[in-house]
Structure formats: C-alpha cells, structure tokens
UniProtKB/Swiss-Prot annotation, chain A:
<keyword id="KW-0793">Thylakoid</keyword>
<keyword id="KW-0934">Plastid</keyword>
<dbReference type="InterPro" id="IPR001469">
    <property type="entry name" value="ATP_synth_F1_dsu/esu"/>
</dbReference>
<dbReference type="GO" id="GO:0045259">
    <property type="term" value="C:proton-transporting ATP synthase complex"/>
</dbReference>
<dbReference type="InterPro" id="IPR036771">
    <property type="entry name" value="ATPsynth_dsu/esu_N"/>
</dbReference>
<protein>
    <recommendedName>
        <fullName>ATP synthase epsilon chain, chloroplastic</fullName>
    </recommendedName>
</protein>
<comment type="function">
    <text>Produces ATP from ADP in the presence of a proton gradient across the membrane.</text>
</comment>
<dbReference type="Pfam" id="PF00401">
    <property type="entry name" value="ATP-synt_DE"/>
</dbReference>
<dbReference type="InterPro" id="IPR020547">
    <property type="entry name" value="ATP_synth_F1_esu_C"/>
</dbReference>
<comment type="similarity">
    <text>Belongs to the ATPase epsilon chain family.</text>
</comment>
<dbReference type="GO" id="GO:0009535">
    <property type="term" value="C:chloroplast thylakoid membrane"/>
</dbReference>
<keyword id="KW-0406">Ion transport</keyword>
<comment type="subunit">
    <text>F-type ATPases have 2 components, CF(1) - the catalytic core - and CF(0) - the membrane proton channel. CF(1) has five subunits: alpha(3), beta(3), gamma(1), delta(1), epsilon(1). CF(0) has three main subunits: a, b and c.</text>
</comment>
<keyword id="KW-0150">Chloroplast</keyword>
<dbReference type="GO" id="GO:0005524">
    <property type="term" value="F:ATP binding"/>
</dbReference>
<dbReference type="Pfam" id="PF02823">
    <property type="entry name" value="ATP-synt_DE_N"/>
</dbReference>
<keyword id="KW-0813">Transport</keyword>
Amino acid sequence: MTLNLCVLTPNRIVWDSEVKEIILPTNSGQIGVLPNHAPIATAVDIGILRIRLNGQWLTMALMGGFAKIGSNEIIVLVNDAEKGSDIDPQEAQQTLEIAEANLKKAEGKRQTIEANLALRRARTRVEAINAV
Amino acid sequence: MSCSNLTMWVSSKTSLSDSTALSFRSSITPVQLPSNNSTTANPSRPSSVTPIHCGLRELRDRIVTVKNTQKITEAMKLVAAAKVRRAQEAVVNARPFSESLVEVLYNINEQLQTDDIDVPLTKVRPVKKVGLVVVTGDRGLCGGFNNAIIKKAEARIAELKGLGLDYTIISVGKKGNSYFIRRPYIPVDRFLDGTSLPTAKEAQAIADDVFSLFISEEVDKVELLYTKFVSLVKAEPVIHTLLPLSPKGEICDINGNCVDAAEDEFFRLTTKEGKLTVERDIMRTKTTEFSAILQFEQDPVQILDALLPLYLNSQILRSLQESLASELAARMTAMSNATDNANELKKSLSIVYNRERQAKITGEILEIVAGANALT
C-alpha cells in the first residue's frame, strides 16, 4: 500500500504526492505515520514535519494547524508550510533574533502572547534547516 | 514684415462674424509681444498653425493631453484586467484548503454536537467593545471603491456609538490608513499595509492581531468590513463577524462553493429587551459523509482549538482576496469609463480645432484675394 500526503496552506498546495513515512508534530508529541495507519484526527503544533522518500528524509516547517489521517490518505491543513530546503538560513536566523528581542521587550498579556507565537515560529524555521 | 502681416490679420479677423470672437481674443495677445513673434513666425511658415494663433495651439495641446491621459487610463484598465485574473487564480488556489477545512470542521462539529465544549475563540461574552477590521485598497483611481467601504465603516461606527459601545479599528490598506490618520478622534488599534497580492502571511498578521485582541479580552467581538466581490461590475461592502466563531456555524456545501463558506450565516448585534444579543441566521446545506470511524488523537477541544484559528485565517485571507478582486474590478470599470470619456472629449476637441483651423484658412484666402484685388 502507498501512503499519500497532501499538505495544504491557504495559498497553495505545498505537497501532494506519495511518501513512505512521515513524522508529524502533533500537540501531544510526535507521531510516525506508516501505510495503513488507523484513521485519526489530530491538531498539529508549530513544528517540523519529517517526510521519508526512498530512504531520504525531508523536513518541512509547519506553522500549526490540523491533520486528518484517513485510509492511506493524509491531509495536513496548516497556516503556512515551508520546505526546509526553501528557507533562507540567514533570514531565518535574523527573524529568530528579532523575535527573541521582541519577547524580552513585550509588556502586558497581549504582547507576550504575540511575541511567544512569533518566537516559536521563528525557532521552528531555523530548526527545519538544521535538522537535515 | 511680420508685424504688418499681423495687423492685416487682426483687421481681417474683425471683419469676420461674431462666431470667431473667441479666437480673435486669443490671437490678439501675440501682438503685444511682437519681438517674440518675429523670431518664430518665419521658420514655422510651412506649418499652417503658427504660434501666432494661440487658440489653435492651446486646442492642439489639449488634444495631445487628452490623448496621453487616454493612453494611461487604457493601460491601467488592461493592467487591472490582467490582475483580476491573477486575483481569481489566487481564489482558486485557496479553494482546496478551504474546502478540506470546511469539510473537516463540519464533520468534527457533527461528532462534537453532543459534547459541551468550551473553546476560547467561540466564547460569547457580553459585548462592551467591538473591533472593526476595515479592509481598503492601497491605491486610488478605482471609482467609489474605497469611499464605499469607508462610508460603511463610518455608518457602523455611528451605529455602535448609538448602542453605547466602545470600538477600535484595525485598518488594512493605505487608503484606509490615511483616512483614519487624518481623523485622530477615531481610535485605531493598528495600521496594516496591504500588498499587491494578499498572502497567508498577511492574513496571519491580521489574524494574530485579532486573536490577541480577542483573547486578552480587550474586545469582545470582532467584525470584518470588506468589499464582497459579486461580479466584475458589482461589488458591495459587507460586514462579517469574525469572532466569536460559532462552533456550530461553519457550514457550507463542499461542492466547490466553499469560497462562500460562511456567507450563509449572518451575525447581527442587536438589542433585545434592552440587552445586547447576537442574532444568528444559519442556512444549513447538505454535506457529504466522510469516514465515520475517526479517532481523535487529542481532546476534541484541542482539535477545535487548532482548527478555528485556521478557519479564522482562511476567512481573513478570503476577504482580502475578495477585496482585492473588487478593487481591481472597480478600477477596470473606472478606467474603462475614463477611456470612453477621453475618446469623447478628444472627438469634440478635434471638431472645435478643425472648425477654427478652417476659419483661419478662410481668413487667409480672403486676405490674399483682397490683396490681389487691390493690386489690379
């Protein structure tokens, strides 16, 4: 049996093809999905999606969302997804530094919420590059 | 030589009928500057419309100006038309996402109907302050597009004031920004710039802002004001409630009509027996079944928590896209009208110009004949 992965963002289809195995960053920890997985619905955290294609591992930074695993059909709905190879390392590192600085400066409940989210996104992007 | 010619010309003009009074007036001005004329009159002899006749030259200049303007408006129209197509493509690209999302949301809602769930984004609080997200365009020259949405916002503000509610504005788009900056008495939470093509990132920025405003309980209700794209010639400003999301409301048919995902559903803030209530009208449409056996990895609340921000995002993105499409369509119509007007103006100006030119030629012939007659 083959496993089909479909990663959708509001803008475009990021990934729509066959994979061997994926590791999905869910809210309750990472789960590996192989063919013939039981149908589940899960929330996807901000984190790294690992995809195995013929013995090769690819990474993708996911910005939080939702995944539905059906009969060998995975649909991942996320706000934004970027392939690790498409991220500019320098730019990602800079964004991370800015986000860290912003969190330190943040005052009040609202700014802290915003800064925390931004920091987590930035960190994930950097990790997606380095994880390869 | 040229000076005597001039006086001759002026005298011959006076002998003409009243209809040329205007051109006579303008042709008299060069007489006051004879030095200027004597230099230009001789080299430009072959071209019939010499600088002496300012009326003609002005007309010609105006025709050229109108022609240039027409070229610009025509180009803008074509650009807008091309961009409308791109905007439509963006909507089409967003469709698979919103379709799957609505499908999943619908089914999860179905399975959760019985449970008593409590998700922050769906919490309906007594409304004290309302956040208004106003989506305008970045540029003008698009007819009444920006005006219409700003008027709608003003009307809504007046309405909220009438209800004794506080409000704050999140302005998206340069036109709205400059409008609200000029009016400091309107509280604005944040100014955001639109870009040429709305992306998920932009929607995310707005969603983040809205999200934190709502979660930190600064506002108790968020409304989105944008221009709904109906057709190329019709667009209307609408108000759509973003938050609180109704956990039962996100329903639509999945047969491709998902761009209008929650359009069937309208929220109105009204007063009922002296209390503020939110009215909901929901039109239920059929949805196809999907795999019945679905386990939830986490708590249903957590899953909804993950889904609703996505939904919020896609709603905002869609409204941005619709707003852009409306703006471009409005610009297309406005520019097409401008081009038509320019054509008309050009036509009437050329008629006037040709008449004047003929009058001038007639005058010259009269002059020559009179001169010849005098000699014999």
